Swiss-Prot record:
<keyword id="KW-0479">Metal-binding</keyword>
<comment type="function">
    <text>Major role in the synthesis of nucleoside triphosphates other than ATP. The ATP gamma phosphate is transferred to the NDP beta phosphate via a ping-pong mechanism, using a phosphorylated active-site intermediate.</text>
</comment>
<feature type="binding site">
    <location>
        <position position="98"/>
    </location>
    <ligand>
        <name>ATP</name>
    </ligand>
</feature>
<feature type="binding site">
    <location>
        <position position="119"/>
    </location>
    <ligand>
        <name>ATP</name>
    </ligand>
</feature>
<dbReference type="InterPro" id="IPR036850">
    <property type="entry name" value="NDK-like_dom_sf"/>
</dbReference>
<feature type="binding site">
    <location>
        <position position="92"/>
    </location>
    <ligand>
        <name>ATP</name>
    </ligand>
</feature>
<dbReference type="GO" id="GO:0006228">
    <property type="term" value="P:UTP biosynthetic process"/>
</dbReference>
<dbReference type="GO" id="GO:0004550">
    <property type="term" value="F:nucleoside diphosphate kinase activity"/>
</dbReference>
<feature type="active site" description="Pros-phosphohistidine intermediate">
    <location>
        <position position="122"/>
    </location>
</feature>
<feature type="binding site">
    <location>
        <position position="109"/>
    </location>
    <ligand>
        <name>ATP</name>
    </ligand>
</feature>
<feature type="binding site">
    <location>
        <position position="64"/>
    </location>
    <ligand>
        <name>ATP</name>
    </ligand>
</feature>
<feature type="binding site">
    <location>
        <position position="16"/>
    </location>
    <ligand>
        <name>ATP</name>
    </ligand>
</feature>
<keyword id="KW-0547">Nucleotide-binding</keyword>
<dbReference type="Pfam" id="PF00334">
    <property type="entry name" value="NDK"/>
</dbReference>
<dbReference type="GO" id="GO:0046872">
    <property type="term" value="F:metal ion binding"/>
</dbReference>
<dbReference type="GO" id="GO:0006183">
    <property type="term" value="P:GTP biosynthetic process"/>
</dbReference>
<dbReference type="InterPro" id="IPR034907">
    <property type="entry name" value="NDK-like_dom"/>
</dbReference>
Amino acid sequence: MSEEAPVHERTFVMVKPDGVQRGLIGEIISRFEDRGLTLVGGKFTRLDTEVARDHYGEHKDKPFFDDLVSFITAGPVFAMVWEGADATRQVRSMVGETDPAESAPGTIRGDYGLDLGRNVIHASDHEDEGANEREIQLFFDESELYTYERIDDPWLYE
């Protein structure tokens, strides 16, 4: 039986203002590192309205768009780029459903999300092939991303 090798890729993740204010950045980073993903970029930033509207552009015609922009610009966020085999799919699985009430226990939103508006974290959509690259470029310059080999890589990848 032949299995196709997983795609080694980068994915964008952002701890939202509610997650930052609740001190969840370290816990979230630990979960992804424990999974074998590599943090290749991370920084605090505060989104201005223009960046927020660009980032959430696919929701611009939805009734909650203005509230979403107001929320995401209300405080600092922690933007990250993770790298690993099937990184986007792994991250989405660990993050859980958009609505924390529908997220399984053990997922980040299932454990820490309070409601649909305060769901702690954003992660690139694995169904939108261009989302990762678009979001990474919106938040990071290439010079801010560092690829390196983790000491446990030989145990994780063949």
